C-alpha cells in the first residue's frame, strides 16, 4: 500500500492548533497568578465572610466557643458572663446566611468581629505564585492567631469553588479564545 499524504491545509491547521496549545500552556500560569493579584480584595472578603459565618479556612467552626472561652473564666460567674456576651453579640452582629453558602453561625460560635478592626486588618499580599493572607496593623491580631490558629486566614473550599466558577474559568475561556483554540 502506498502512503497517503495529508493535504497541506490540514497540516497547517494542525500546526496552528499545536501552536495555540503551546501559547496557552506558556501563558496560563502567569495569567492566573496575575488574576489572583488583581483580585486580592476578593480573597480578603472570602476570609472575612468565612469568619463572619463562624468558620475557619477548613470550614470548621471557630473554637473555643464562647461558653468554652478561657477569657470568661476570669469572671466571677463565667457562664453568666459568656451568656451575656453571646446575647450582646447576637444583637450587634446577628448571624446571616453567607453568599458562599455557609449557614448562619449559632449563638455560641465566635465570628471575631466587634468593631471591625480585625476584619479591616486582613490583608492579601501578592507573592510570586499567589497570595499570602495576614493581619496587618492591629495590635491584638497575634492574640487572635494564638487562640484560633493561622487557619483563620486560609481560603476554604466554598470560597475556592466560588472563585473558580466566577473568576478563574471565565479567564481560562478567554485565554483559550485568545490562543485560537
Regions found by a protein language model. Name each.
Residues 2-181:
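Short, Lys/Arg-rich flexible segments
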Amino acid at each position: 500500500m502506498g502512503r497517503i499524504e495529508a493535504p497541506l491545509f490540514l497540516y497547517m491547521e494542525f500546526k496552528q492548533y499545536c501552536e495555540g496549545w503551546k501559547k496557552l500552556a506558556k501563558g496560563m500560569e502567569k495569567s492566573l497568578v496575575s488574576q489572583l493579584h488583581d483580585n486580592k480584595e476578593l480573597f480578603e472578603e472570602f476570609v472575612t465572610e468565612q469568619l463572619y459565618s463562624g468558620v475557619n479556612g477548613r470550614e470548621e467552626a471557630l473554637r473555643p466557643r464562647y461558653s468554652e472561652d478561657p477569657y470568661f473564666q476570669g469572671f466571677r460567674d463565667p457562664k453568666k458572663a459568656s451568656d451575656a456576651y453571646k446575647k450582646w453579640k447576637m444583637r450587634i452582629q446577628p448571624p446571616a446566611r453567607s453568599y458562599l453558602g455557609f449557614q448562619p453561625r449559632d449563638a455560641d460560635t465566635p465570628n471575631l468581629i466587634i468593631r471591625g478592626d480585625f476584619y479591616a486588618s486582613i490583608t492579601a499580599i501578592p507573592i510570586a505564585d499567589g497570595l499570602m493572607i495576614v493581619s496587618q496593623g492591629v495590635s491584638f491580631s497575634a492574640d487572635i492567631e494564638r487562640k484560633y490558629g493561622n487557619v483563620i486566614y486560609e481560603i476554604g473550599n466554598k470560597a475556592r469553588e466560588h472563585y473558580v466558577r466566577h473568576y478563574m474559568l471565565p479567564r481560562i475561556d478567554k485565554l483559550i479564545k485568545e490562543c485560537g483554540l
